[in-house]
Amino acid sequence: MSILFYVMFLAYLRGVQGNSMDQRSLPEDSLNSLIIKLIQADILKNKLSKQMVDVKENYQSTLPKAEAPPREPAKSEFQPVTAMGPELLRQQRRYSSPRVLLSDSTPLEPPPLYLMEDYVGSPVAANRTSRRKRYAEHKSHRGEYSVCDSESLWVTDKSSAIDIRGHQVTVLGEIKTGNSPVKQYFYETRCKEARPVKNGCRGIDDKHWNSQCKTSQTYVRALTSENNKLVGWRWIRIDTSCVCALSRKIGRT
């Protein structure tokens, strides 16, 4: 850009000098020599500027980089068994599931969300028979039947389970909290039998289908430990429903 400016400026001077009668025009050779010198000076200037930029970049690249401040280790969701504190119990609200209960006494009723299921109560007291019967009478319409028969109950002695990673973990049966320890209970639902009728599930066309009742599982949060080291809330599998599994009979369309 600067070279073009010099050429235009010199051309302007030549025009002015050509129109002036009082001044002598510069010789052609001297004018060309002046233009060449100006162009060379501009090229040299650009070359020096580029070299200075390269030197500056090389110098900055040799400087030691400022070390980033060390990150604080993220707070682990798991605690050592010996250091298990009340914080884990306070996390129950965040991780709570209606099928998991922490209590200092055995629950006598199903969770509110599962009042309509076939609940099998504890046979400790005889006066609870009517209560168990009331929970079991959930069929409100005559003539309606389930394809599979299921039963639900509180599991009070669960000691191990499979977590979401496929690892076997230990389920904490008792958690010490001050004066009164609490226990962990699981409300599970499973099939009463694989074949409620002779040929499998109830109401299935056995001419075209093979059927069988199977217990299905899902994940809930529970207090567990792995290798008796770290305690925390993990996703584990428990029995939660009974479903009918179908497969088409070979040769049937």
From Swiss-Prot:
Localization recorded for this chain is: Secreted
Q: Which UniProt keywords apply?
A: Cleavage on pair of basic residues, Disulfide bond, Glycoprotein, Growth factor, Secreted, Signal
- PROSITE patterns the record matches: NGF_1 (PS00248), NGF_2 (PS50270)
**Is Signal a UniProt keyword of this protein?**
yes
Molecular-function GO terms, alphabetical: growth factor activity; nerve growth factor receptor binding
Origin, by domain of life?
Answer: Eukaryota
Answer yes or no on keyword Signal.
Answer: yes
Instruction: Extract one GO BP annotation from the record.
Output: negative regulation of neuron apoptotic process
Recorded hits in Pfam families, A to Z, give: NGF, NTF3_N
Q: What does this protein do?
A: Seems to promote the survival of visceral and proprioceptive sensory neurons.
User: What name goes with this protein?
Assistant: Neurotrophin-3
